Amino acid sequence: MRVYLHHLVWETDKEGFKKRINEYLTIADKHHISTIFVFLDDCWNPVYQAGKQPEPQPGVHNSGWARDPGDLYYKGDTAVILPVLESYVKDILITFKDDKRIVLWDLYNEPGGSGGYRYGERSLPLLQKIFTWGRTVNPSQPLSAGVWDMSLTNLNKFQLENSDVITYHTYEGVNSHQQLIDTLKQYGRPMICTEYMARTQNSTFQDIMPMLKRENIGAINWGLVAGKTNTIFAWDTPLPDVVEPPLWFHDIFRSDGTPYSTEEVECIRSLTK
């Protein structure tokens, strides 16, 4: 399971936040689920606040998702936010640095930004800093930051040269996905695809999972249960007047626990035995 954290929740209640992380890990481990935690994120809403969050917008993909640090860093006073981020990252890493329930730290999700205003290469200094913080703590688990946009040359170079495990995102079909794998193989490190599976993009379990298994690449799709994130709806394709789209974009299970597609679940089971 890949789980996103946020510095504002830590800042609001440090000990409570770490307690809840541990409670989640206990539940996940009971069900034989290992975890990748994500720290920073350049996707979706750049402004946020603590407390009750906005209600999801009907039919809109990820309407409530918050970047971290977002505008606090890119439009604010970096001298104020950087020490907070450093303390946050180091505190979590030190607390869980030898926790075997965590398989990897994903330091920065999609640096450069997607889902609205993009920071582009401006994200490189912060990316470099979080790797420095991570190496200072030196946790037992590997550190990584997934490549996701091949046009972000400087970011990609740093990510690939500094990640213990090569992680990447792609929602393309089999041929494009295979080309990306062939490119990333040259680094000679273990690989995990930490985001894939968008049905309307021809990135499906039935097509992609056999390829990843053949290539000995770990696979984490986006989305488990349809819920407040509304990721059954596609990016930039709001459908506010329908309960669900004709073809789900992400996610595996309905809110009642039944699978969206029995065929998909059988495919996943057969490939993970």
Per-segment meaning from a language model:
Residues L180:
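Conserved catalytic-core segment of NTP-binding enzymes
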Residues M1-S163, H169-S176, Y187, Y196, ...:
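Active-site mouth of glycoside hydrolases
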Residues S270-K273:
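Catalytic domains of carbohydrate-active enzymes that cleave complex glycans
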Residues I192-E195, G218-G223:
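Conserved active-site loop/cleft motifs that coordinate metal ions or position small ligands
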Residues T229-L239:
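Structured C-terminal subdomain patch of bacterial secreted/periplasmic proteins
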